[in-house]
């Protein structure tokens, strides 16, 4: 579980599939109202309080984004007036609005373009030639949409050898990142860099 403070009232939590499995949960379980899900949320809020000083007092909004074969991104936003209204809420009660979204893209982050060149050889060997490469905040990102007949888990296993899953969405990369290669990145890299 990775935590990141986005601003005073908002945090982002990245849960890997291993984090969920360790707690006996699947991605599908998160959409259910169960004791395990409540315990996971309580653990996340306790860790956010310990690591970031983020106290979830009062009403909060929870946005859950499912990243295909990578895990989940949970964005928690507390009401800006929550600190002044602490008396109105019971300690064990948190009012939540939940927004759910699932991304079809698999996005991985790489420290150098050389990592993507090496990865592209492995991807082309298994028949994947598409993909889009972005540069953002000193890092490279590869987004894959069409996996052909391959399972997302199989492709993620190859991607994980060269890079790391990211919590950035495709929308952020499209808006703020620099587009390096569009559509057939793996094939283009193999043509020009092998």
From Swiss-Prot:
It holds the Pfam family MecA. Belongs to the MecA family. Keywords: Competence, Sporulation. GO terms for biological process: establishment of competence for transformation; negative regulation of establishment of competence for transformation; negative regulation of sporulation resulting in formation of a cellular spore; sporulation resulting in formation of a cellular spore. Enables the recognition and targeting of unfolded and aggregated proteins to the ClpC protease or to other proteins involved in proteolysis. Also involved in Spx degradation by ClpC. Acts negatively in the development of competence by binding ComK and recruiting it to the ClpCP protease. When overexpressed, inhibits sporulation. InterPro entries: MecA_C_sf, Neg-reg_MecA. This is Adapter protein MecA 2. It comes from Bacillus subtilis (strain 168). The lineage of its organism: Bacteria, Bacillati, Bacillota, Bacilli, Bacillales. One of its GO terms (molecular function) is protein-macromolecule adaptor activity. NCBIfam families: PRK02899.1 (NF002781). The gene is mecB. Homodimer. The N-terminal domain has binding sites for ComK and probably for unfolded/aggregated proteins; the C-terminal domain interacts with ClpC. Coiled coil: none annotated. It comes from the Bacteria. PANTHER family: ADAPTER PROTEIN MECA, ADAPTER PROTEIN MECA 2.
